[in-house]
């Protein structure tokens, strides 16, 4: 499954400036996803993080991974009155700064489901270099 921004807007409840996935390259719904976030100098967070030395905040890289994971849970179908809530982060690591002009590759792989909580192993890369990673827990719930 592939998705463009118009599909993503229908799947996720997020909107500008907090929609942090631009395209889905491949997705096996419920199992894995590979998506892209194009990082541009026009991002609002670069105004203050950091003036003269723009770096994408690590928490937003993790949020990008969580949004990609939510798309993986939902697939391309619209789930009425449901939303995927980000519940926790485990073992977050930040290895290299992400700067304007980078294409952030978001990879999320399903690791398990327990008591309705999805567990994903996530990695963010620029090119072939890993820039961040974490285990993300999320739950599909009523809105």
From Swiss-Prot:
It comes from the Bacteria. GO terms for molecular function: (3R)-hydroxyacyl-[acyl-carrier-protein] dehydratase activity. One of its GO terms (biological process) is lipid A biosynthetic process. It is an enzyme of class 4 (lyase). Keywords: Cytoplasm, Lipid A biosynthesis, Lipid biosynthesis, Lipid metabolism, Lyase. The active site is at residue 49. Coiled coil: none annotated. Its main location: cytoplasm. It holds the Pfam family FabA. GO terms for cellular component: cytoplasm; membrane. It catalyses: a (3R)-hydroxyacyl-[ACP] = a (2E)-enoyl-[ACP] + H2O. Disulfide bonds: none annotated. It is found in: Cytoplasm. Its EC number is 4.2.1.59. CDD domains: FabZ. Involved in unsaturated fatty acids biosynthesis. Catalyzes the dehydration of short chain beta-hydroxyacyl-ACPs and long chain saturated and unsaturated beta-hydroxyacyl-ACPs. Belongs to the thioester dehydratase family. FabZ subfamily. This is 3-hydroxyacyl-[acyl-carrier-protein] dehydratase FabZ. The lineage of its organism: Bacteria, Pseudomonadati, Pseudomonadota, Alphaproteobacteria, Rickettsiales.
